[in-house]
Amino acid sequence: MTSEKTIPAKPDKTSTILVPVFIPAVLVIVLMVIGTMSNPDAAGKLFAEILTYMTNTFGWFYMLAVAIFLVFVVAVAFSSWGNIKLGPDHAEPEYSFVAWFAMLFSAGYGIALLFFGVAEPVLHYSAPPEGPALTIDAAKQAMQIAFFHWGFHIWAIYCLVGLSLAYFAFRHGLPLSMRSTLYPIIGEKIHGPMGHTVDVFAILGTMFGIATTLGLSVAQINAGLNYLWPSVPVNTTVQIIAIVAITALATLSVVAGLDKGVKRLSMLNMVLAIGLMLFVFAVGPTIFILNTFMENTGSYLSNIVERTFSLQAYTSSDWIGNWTLFIFGWTISWAPFVGLFIAKISRGRTIRQFVVGVMVVPTIFTFLWFSVFGDTALHLIMVDGYTALIDEVQADHAIALFKLLEHLPLTSIVSFITVILIITFFVTSSDSGSLVIDSLASGGVTHTPVWQRVFWASTEGVVAAALLLAGGLGALQTATILSALPFAIIMLIAAVGMWRALIIEGHQEVSLTQQMQSSPGGHKSGPGLWKKRLANLVDFPPRDAVEKFIRTTGFQSMHRVEQELEEQG
């Protein structure tokens, strides 16, 4: 499945840009930014119309695609293919499980848990998609929906992309780029216009997905600063300033690279996030949290199939578009970024280890997070009677977490730490995204010049600022759902491609095993077999056969070793 074209060239000192990918991607981004900033009001109105159209027309496709992704990765993991390594059979993981999970956690969730951990359960409780609001059933439904939105489904999206990339790159020597996932379908055409187009869509999806994250981040940072220092206003100007300042921090991290910058920030994120969760668990309604965690998990698992295919087809509500489709679309648009990033850090793990690690561990952590923060908020409303929290969250989603912390001990200190955590998540998302986009725009090259990484980190900030000016969260929602559509199609094709590749590898393994078992040199006994074994041992190939093997196999393998050693420094 490999070819001489597939090995990424060693990056030169000035540029590793792949022009047919870089230029179209930058052109689309520049046109979008110019069009948005030249007339923000008109752009905002257009985004709203597009969002309505996409929701009504393609909602069914998004839901079906995500269901297929989930079934596919689970089926592959628990099949006989689950023992296949993402790399040579002798490869070992490069990172410890803790460091690996920390980077998974920071890249895959980032600001989402902090932004929606309190806000989403409260909003669903006060305005559920089904049934009356402000009831016990509404509270149960709110937590079930939150679990569904951030559970197995979104990690299946990341898992499919990451698994496909890691398999084709590390197992078969193809570039660590989205185009490689289509090799079993289109073959060598991945090196031409079709492959370039796939990577362009991957860049655009990643760019708008990260821009959405940055937009949500600065909104929550602004709310936190206003909460701590009321003289700081909540407006777009402050949020743009925050984007500029924190993009500068992200640039410093991205210059440091994966092992130094991203890994250290990811570990810091995980420590701060777990510390914050344990604090709220300890000082909040601990027993209530434990009870609701068990009940919510059971409710989620028992209703997962119905939720997966629910589109509210018999109602005229826009709830599904504003919530489920937005979150799934946001996740799909993030998939090239998160998938490529987790593929980079997962070399040497088996397919089963990869799928279980990517899907199960983060999902359990998510359920714990929403139970701690979401159920603490619901307890505050339903038991303690602080119903004003509903109005505060509805007025400004970004302030939800800080309003919850207001009713816990050490409010100012914990709120300040929360702002720091949001900033570090912001920086991690930006610098990880910059590394991934830069690799995609370079045809899969992993070691690129500093100026390219700086360029993409800066571009992410500009796009986020432009979308904020054009209508805030609504514009961000539209950009993510729109960019997710073509990439969802690419992901379905990639799943078919990987399935075909695994079937071929399985057939080769069976064939090799049968040959070894039937070989005259096998462990069989009987009259005359020793003569066959001896003849096999002294049956040396002719000189021309040896020279052909060296030319076609030996030189190519040594060239790959040379490239790998050069990239590793």
Which role fits each region the language model picked out?
Residues 2-138:
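N-terminal alpha-helical transmembrane segments of multi-pass membrane transport
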Residues 7-14, 39-54, 73-94, 142-149, ...:
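Membrane-water interface regions at transmembrane-helix termini and the short interhelical loops
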